[in-house]
């Protein structure tokens, strides 16, 4: 697959979820450090918010603990914030200081894109909020885009778990 040309339309991850909560509440869950710590990340992962600077150019820096003693780091660099309608950010794996790093998974053979642009929109109808996430690699090589496409199912599962946690968080 690394040698196959990957069309840009093929490299977009698109996930939509309807949540039983008003848009303002869902927006706060995406923009409040305490809330993010409770629902962001795959199921079974403990999130620690290291920094949340919610403004264009600001950073959300976090650690993910899968088990005691095994931490990974990630970050968002916000590009656009239009409350309560839209958030755009570049997501990357990071080191403890917030610098970009390669994905820490050997099976990805250092071919995971360093940066992904994510755009999340929030629309409300009848007291329920639809979140629509679209993500794609940026500044990526052909091989990195191919690896992104090859792992779409895993990303669907990972974001699905996060959005399940978000739905549960919103019931509290």
Can you say where each PLM-predicted feature lies in the sequence?
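Beta-strand/loop substructures that line and gate deep hydrophobic ligand-binding cavities in soluble
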Residues: 91, 99-157
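Charge-dense, helix-prone N-terminal extensions
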Residues: 5-8, 31-34, 50, 62-64, ...
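Hydrophobic ligand-binding cavity/cleft-lining segments
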Residues: 1-46
């Amino acid at each position: 697959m690394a040698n196959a040309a990957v069309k840009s339309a093929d490299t977009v991850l698109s996930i939509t979820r309807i949540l039983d909560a008003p848009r303002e509440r869902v927006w706060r869950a995406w923009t409040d450090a305490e809330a993010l710590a409770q629902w962001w990340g795959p199921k079974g992962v403990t999130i620690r918010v290291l920094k949340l600077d919610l403004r264009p150019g600001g950073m959300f820096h976090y650690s993910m603990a899968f088990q005691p003693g095994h931490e990974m780091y990630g970050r968002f660099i916000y590009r656009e914030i239009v409350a309560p309608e839209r958030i755009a950010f570049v997501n990357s794996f990071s080191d403890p200081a917030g610098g970009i790093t390669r994905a820490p998974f050997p099976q990805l053979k250092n071919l995971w894109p360093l940066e992904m642009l994510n755009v999340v929109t929030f629309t409300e109808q009848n007291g329920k909020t639809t979140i629509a996430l679209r993500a794609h690699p940026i500044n990526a090589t052909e091989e990195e885009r191919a690896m992104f496409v090859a792992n779409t199912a895993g990303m669907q599962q990972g974001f699905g778990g996060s959005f399940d946690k978000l739905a549960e968080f919103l019931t509290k």
